[in-house]
């Protein structure tokens, strides 16, 4: 799990209170999308090393246009083709920002497969998408 540095201690506390250590390996660490985006791609692996992520869950991260590109770049960087499932849950505050996010996500890599989930089952104020990067063909 990642967030801004100030919130990581709270995340760690929530993990320790709610997830038995034997169940799974959940790690909380800070990740600044702005720093990631501004780091040259040739240096990213050294500056931002993560193990392969099974599930990338982005909740309530789409709310301001200035963050859309940063979030999409971060999701693309963290997602391993064929291995990482990305789940994005959005509160539908600003239709234009949500549209901008979806367009940016789809355009960030042609291998993304993205599905809308729960239409008609979620509160109308929320939307949920699941995405995966297809593995490269050999």
Tell what function each PLM region has.
Residues 1-138:
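S-adenosylmethionine-dependent methyltransferases
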């Amino acid at each position: 799990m990642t967030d801004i540095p100030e919130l990581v201690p709270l995340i760690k506390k929530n993990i320790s209170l709610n997830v038995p250590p034997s169940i799974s390996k959940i790690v909380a660490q800070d990740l600044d999308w702005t720093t990631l985006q501004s780091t040259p791609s040739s240096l990213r692996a050294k500056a931002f090393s993560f193990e392969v992520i099974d599930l990338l869950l982005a909740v309530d991260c789409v709310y301001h246009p200035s963050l859309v590109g940063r979030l999409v770049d971060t999701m693309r960087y963290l997602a391993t083709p064929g291995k990482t499932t990305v789940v994005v849950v959005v509160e539908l505050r600003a239709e234009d920002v949500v549209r901008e996010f979806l367009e940016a996500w789809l355009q960030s890599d042609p291998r993304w497969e993205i599905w809308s989930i729960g239409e008609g089952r979620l509160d109308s104020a929320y939307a949920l998408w699941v995405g995966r990067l297809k593995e490269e063909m050999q």
